[in-house]
Amino acid sequence: KEAVRLIRKSAVQGNAGAQFNLGTRYITGHGVIQDYTRAFTMFQAAAEQGLALAQFNLGLHYFKGRGVDRDDTQSYMWLEVSRLNGYANAVETINIVANKLTGSDVAKAKDLARECFDKKFKGC
């Protein structure tokens, strides 16, 4: 309980690593009540600070509809952002999501990802 309290405090103060850690705990229910919506919120906060693994997890949440409405275009966009930001393991998942989209939707998602990357992940 003390560990979760300290992680939560650090997350509220804007620490991206703590936000990611807390998001992961909300998925697993480790030390907190499982809550995909809160997990999504924590991953979003960390993703906007440039944490590639959080960006990848946002993409997964959009793909699975966990804590957010399912949206394959947003999923692809965040997965691509994580790849552009150095998370090479995103490629396999990007290909899976791409199979759910039309060619024009993939192009749109790639454009959104590039815009997001260029804006330093703010307001994506």
Predicted regions and their residues:
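Predominantly extracellular beta-rich ligand-binding scaffolds that present long acidic/polar faces
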Residues: G23, Q55, G59, R70-L79
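N-terminal segments that cap or nucleate solenoid repeat domains
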Residues: A3-A11
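Terminal, low-structured helical/coil segments at or just beyond the last alpha-helical repeat
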Residues: A88-C124
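Short helix-capping/linker turns of helical repeat alpha-solenoids
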Residues: V12-N15, T28-H30, D35, E48-L51, ...
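TPR/TPR-like alpha-solenoid repeats
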Residues: S10, R25, A46, H61, ...
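Hydrophobic face of amphipathic alpha-helices that form TPR/SEL1-like repeat modules
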Residues: L6, Q19-T28, V32, M42, ...
